[in-house]
């Protein structure tokens, strides 16, 4: 395999149920992978150099999650001669709450684990991923999941097939700014997966994000006015949002009514991560 996909995710709900002494928030969420991916290519070298060939403008290699993931894996494996040239085709919106950076890091760990001949088990890679970010482990886990803790306690869930209209407002939201906001609800009562299956659940981050970027409220309001959707919510800390539909035709009908000043895409939900068996 020359090209490795890094799929986006949706948070079908996201509750903040507490806060640890170290400042990390305790969450409940359902992660769903969708068929919209970044694509990564890895050119293996043996000169000890790890380089991202096409860094996102404004991002340094010190901050780049792909480079950080590669360096962390090599450091723990203990072979400094391992090198790689990374090329990223970026399709997932930045700062949108779709997990693009975390997914890129996870795909880097999954791919280099094989390409470098390390062959560690997924559980070990998930522990490395958690050092890079709370959302990284689920992409290595490879299954849609009910998540608890800071997002690392994962329980596989089988979700019904669904299609989504995902809207992409022209704004970015800082995850850190949302989670440090004094207005964030941090004491939502925990629920069971069965309650989510019966339609319970919301996104506690939505009100904060809407105050930071009022355009989010307007776009969410438009989605909620459309007929045929089974769920409308912001994903993660935003700014992207989604409406869920039981069929592609229903999703495309609503997307066809999208006002000219709004943008997005139609996509299907995935049953598994495309690299779950790699």
Curated annotation (Swiss-Prot):
Pathway where this protein functions: Isoprenoid biosynthesis; isopentenyl diphosphate biosynthesis via DXP pathway; isopentenyl diphosphate from 1-deoxy-D-xylulose 5-phosphate: step 3/6
Domain of life, source organism: Bacteria
Annotated GO biological process: isopentenyl diphosphate biosynthetic process, methylerythritol 4-phosphate pathway; terpenoid biosynthetic process
Oxidoreductase recorded as keyword: no
GO molecular-function term, one example from the UniProt record: 4-(cytidine 5'-diphospho)-2-C-methyl-D-erythritol kinase activity
Active site: 9, 135
InterPro entries: GHMP_kinase_C_dom, GHMP_kinase_C_sf, GHMP_kinase_N_dom, IspE, Ribosomal_Su5_D2-typ_SF, Ribsml_uS5_D2-typ_fold_subgr
UniProt protein name: 4-diphosphocytidyl-2-C-methyl-D-erythritol kinase
Catalytically driven reaction(s): 4-CDP-2-C-methyl-D-erythritol + ATP = 4-CDP-2-C-methyl-D-erythritol 2-phosphate + ADP + H(+)
Lineage of the organism: Bacteria, Pseudomonadati, Pseudomonadota, Betaproteobacteria, Nitrosomonadales
EC assignment: 2.7.1.148
Keyword entries, A-Z: ATP-binding, Isoprene biosynthesis, Kinase, Nucleotide-binding, Transferase
Function: Catalyzes the phosphorylation of the position 2 hydroxy group of 4-diphosphocytidyl-2C-methyl-D-erythritol.
NCBIfam families: ispE (TIGR00154), PRK14608.1 (NF011202)
Record-annotated membrane-spanning stretches: none
């Amino acid at each position: 395999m020359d090209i490795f996909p890094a799929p986006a995710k949706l948070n079908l709900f996201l509750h903040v149920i507490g806060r640890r002494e170290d400042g990390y928030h305790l969450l409940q969420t359902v992660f769903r992978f969708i068929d919209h991916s970044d694509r990564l290519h890895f050119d293996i070298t043996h000169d000890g150099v790890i380089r991202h060939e096409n860094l996102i403008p404004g991002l340094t290699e010190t901050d780049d999650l792909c480079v950080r993931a590669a360096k962390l894996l090599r450091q723990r494996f203990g072979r400094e001669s391992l090198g790689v040239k990374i090329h990223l085709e970026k399709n997932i919106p930045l700062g949108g709450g779709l997990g693009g950076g975390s997914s890129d890091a996870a795909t880097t760990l999954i791919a280099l684990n094989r390409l470098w001949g390390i062959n560690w088990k997924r559980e070990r890679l998930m522990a490395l991923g958690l050092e890079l970010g709370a959302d990284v482990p689920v992409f290595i886990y490879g299954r849609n999941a009910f998540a608890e803790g800071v997002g690392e306690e994962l329980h596989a869930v089988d979700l019904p097939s669904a299609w989504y209209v995902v809207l992409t407002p022209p704004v970015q939201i800082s995850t850190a700014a949302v989670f440090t906001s004094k207005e964030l609800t941090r004491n939502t009562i925990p629920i069971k997966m069965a309650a989510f299956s019966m339609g319970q659940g919301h996104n506690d981050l939505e009100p904060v994000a809407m105050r930071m970027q009022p355009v989010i409220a307007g776009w969410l309001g438009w989605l909620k006015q459309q007929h045929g959707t089974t769920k409308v919510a912001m994903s993660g800390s935003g700014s992207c949002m989604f409406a869920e539909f039981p069929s592609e035709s229903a999703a495309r009908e609503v997307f066809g009514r999208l006002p000219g000043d709004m943008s997005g895409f139609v996509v299907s939900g995935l049953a598994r991560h495309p690299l779950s068996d790699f």
